[in-house]
């Protein structure tokens, strides 16, 4: 007897993605494919796409959290490029990482040089008191 009967074979386990094994939302399989197709190296280790997907997921979560806070500060429920710009430029480390990046429709940080602000003179206060 060959053992290929219906009752003899084991049921195949449900497929489990590498992303779910690593506890990630970002696609490990797709990152692996892109690493192979991108001609970055002749061979790609099994851990490399997992690590890269984890790093990308962390950076994305960090930026989105700060952008969500910026949107909430502006009393908005939808994140727009302006919120991403404010989030990145107000964070020292993200600003350094993405210093050369231009965000379309991002605008600029509000900034007025101290010299251009009106001077607070005490002569007006003394004149009113007399």
UniProtKB/Swiss-Prot annotation:
Any idea which residues bear N6-succinyllysine here? 10, 96
Offer one example of a GO biological process linked to this entry.
heterochromatin formation
A Pfam family of this chain: Histone_H2A_C
* Residues where N6-lactoyllysine is found: 10
* Compositional bias segments (type: Basic residues): 7-19
* A GO term for molecular function: structural constituent of chromatin
Known consequence of changing residue 91 to A? Decreased interaction with VRK1
Mark the residues carrying the PTM N6-(2-hydroxyisobutyryl)lysine.
6, 10, 37, 75-76, 96, 119
Q: How does it assemble?
A: The nucleosome is a histone octamer containing two molecules each of H2A, H2B, H3 and H4 assembled in one H3-H4 heterotetramer and two H2A-H2B heterodimers. The octamer wraps approximately 147 bp of DNA. Interacts with VRK1; the interaction is mediated by the nucleosome acidic patch, a cluster of negatively charged residues of H2A and H2B forming a cleft within the nucleosome core.
Q: What is this protein called?
A: Histone H2A type 1
